[in-house]
From Swiss-Prot:
This is Superoxide dismutase [Mn], mitochondrial. GO terms for molecular function: antioxidant activity; manganese ion binding; superoxide dismutase activity. Pfam families: Sod_Fe_C, Sod_Fe_N. Homotetramer. Residues 1-17 form a transit peptide. GO terms for biological process: determination of adult lifespan; heart morphogenesis; paracrine signaling; positive regulation of mitophagy; reactive oxygen species metabolic process; regulation of hemocyte proliferation; regulation of metabolic process; regulation of synaptic plasticity. Its cofactor is Mn(2+). It catalyses: 2 superoxide + 2 H(+) = H2O2 + O2. Binds 1 Mn(2+) ion per subunit. Belongs to the iron/manganese superoxide dismutase family. Its main location: mitochondrion. GO terms for cellular component: mitochondrial matrix; mitochondrion.
Amino acid sequence: MFVARKISPNCKPGVRGKHTLPKLPYDYAALEPIICREIMELHHQKHHQTYVNNLNAAEEQLEEAKSKSDTTKLIQLAPALRFNGGGHINHTIFWQNLSPNKTQPSDDLKKAIESQWKSLEEFKKELTTLTVAVQGSGWGWLGFNKKSGKLQLAALPNQDPLEASTGLIPLFGIDVWEHAYYLQYKNVRPSYVEAIWDIANWDDISCRFQEAKKLGC
């Protein structure tokens, strides 16, 4: 049901595998001093794992409700599927969007950014401002608009998944739930968002951009 799950090409139609917590492509301490080890462990092992567990539970209930043609239950499950499914999708992208290694946008992505925001720094400033301004918990996103063929920024509340909510293909997401930064940055969200650019994985973001363009009109 959700893109975060890897499905074997040999799987039979209708056979649902359980979602699992993805392994990080780096050590928990690898993103220090930008994000400390304690935050990474809690964020990955506790918060993301909870989304995975709750998504699996909701999907099991969904299958049962479908088998019983229980329309009321199907409707009741929609918020849990959106919240936990979104949490799983968003975090799976988030881990890959970060890297302890210094990277740069591909020439193609840099050109696209500069054509819309004049410079990479202006783009960073606009996404930072948008993300910091999220009320409560949520995410700031760089996405790709398949219809226009252009990059687009968006801010979404809670764990709302970008593509399901807006149609934009997610390229880079910034998590501004307090569990992502509070132990280290306290209530100074701007400092966290500004610092995260130092660990942005432009290799991953650039790759997502290339793949997204293939889906455009």
